[in-house]
């Protein structure tokens, strides 16, 4: 079937899913939504059942238990009936004419897999303010030494690169051939990077298109989806999955990137994550408490 199947895994994020579903359906190129209910404990399943009964373009499957993002994406892709799949998210917002723009630029660039600019927008910002802020970003889109990239950078023109923002558009058969690796557990860190790098290594052309924009709202105290675990456990999964990713793809990384010794890279990555996401925030809280105690005793 011509058109686009949008695959959306979701877990306990019903307020955001309610906004996302009609937004995707408003895009002319979208023929169906495939929602994968991944062990939700809220009223997501009931909402999706009712929405599907009202609109035949909405299809769903219930994992019953939480199987994780990669497994859920693969399951949704297998159920997709359109020629193209877009890997959606339950809190994603897309710009006007998003899919028309991506399809047009996919044709002109010869891209096999294409992603738009993905901006992480603060809750207090408007879309325009978030775009203006990220327009100031400089430097390369992909940093081959740190194995990272800026998903919201304004590159001005389309460009081929080995890493892309997570929301991707490609032919359904490509997603089914490459597949997400569902051995990435926990918060599934690196699942998209792993998929993209393997696709790149297989000869597929990956293109970043700044002319189509998606927005992820940075939600304070988000406890749904991959954010449902505690901070220490979340960082632990990031480190484990990064180790798995680097070890698994070490030959391709050595050929296409500049990370140096994989063991040293993995160690540096782990130290930086633990310090910036666990130790430093704890120090800030500790410092504030000391100042508060000092002010209280001085009053």
PLM segments and residue spans:
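A conserved acidic beta->alpha catalytic loop
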Residues: 23, 37-47, 65, 92
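Short, flexible, basic/aromatic active-site loop/helix in glycosyltransferases
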Residues: 135-160
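Short aromatic/hydrophobic "clamp" motif used to bind/position activated sugar donors
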Residues: 85
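Short, well-formed alpha-helical segments that are part of the catalytic scaffolds
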Residues: 12-26
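Glycine-rich, basic loop-to-helix element that forms the pyrophosphate-binding segment
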Residues: 63-80
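Conserved donor NDP-sugar-binding/catalytic core segment of glycosyltransferases
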Residues: 97-135
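A short, conserved alpha-helix in the catalytic core of glycosyltransferases
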Residues: 162-170, 174-178, 185-212
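Non-catalytic, C-terminal membrane-associated alpha-helical segments of glycosyltransferases
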Residues: 231-241, 247, 251-299
């Amino acid at each position: 079937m011509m058109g686009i199947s949008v695959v959306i895994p979701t877990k306990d994020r019903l307020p955001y899913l309610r906004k996302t579903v009609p937004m995707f359906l408003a895009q002319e190129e979208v023929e169906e939504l495939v929602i994968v209910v991944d062990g939700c404990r809220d009223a997501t399943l009931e909402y999706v059942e009712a929405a599907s009964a009202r609109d035949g373009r909405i299809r769903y499957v219930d994992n019953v238990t939480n199987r994780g993002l990669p497994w859920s994406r693969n399951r949704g892709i297998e159920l997709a009936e359109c020629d193209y799949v877009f890997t959606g998210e339950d809190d994603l917002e897309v710009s006007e004419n998003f899919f028309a723009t991506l399809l047009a630029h996919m044709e002109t660039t010869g891209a096999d897999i294409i992603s738009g600019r993905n901006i992480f927008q603060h809750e207090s910002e408007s879309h325009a303010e978030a775009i203006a802020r990220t327009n100031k970003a400089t430097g390369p889109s992909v940093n081959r030494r740190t194995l990272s990239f800026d998903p919201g950078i304004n590159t001005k023109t389309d460009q081929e690169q080995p890493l892309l923002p997570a929301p991707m558009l490609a032919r359904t058969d490509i997603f089914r051939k490459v597949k997400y690796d569902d051995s990435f557990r926990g918060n599934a860190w690196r699942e998209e990077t792993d998929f993209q790098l393997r696709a790149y290594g297989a000869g597929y052309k990956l293109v970043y298109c700044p002319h189509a924009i998606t927005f992820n709202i940075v939600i304070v105290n988000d406890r749904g989806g991959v954010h449902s675990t505690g901070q220490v456990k979340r960082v632990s999964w990031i480190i484990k999955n990064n180790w798995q990713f680097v070890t698994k793809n070490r030959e391709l990384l050595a050929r296409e990137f500049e990370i140096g010794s994989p063991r040293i890279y993995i160690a540096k990555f782990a130290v930086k994550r633990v310090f910036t996401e666990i130790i430093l925030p704890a120090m800030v809280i500790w410092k504030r408490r000391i100042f508060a105690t000092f002010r209280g005793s001085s009053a």
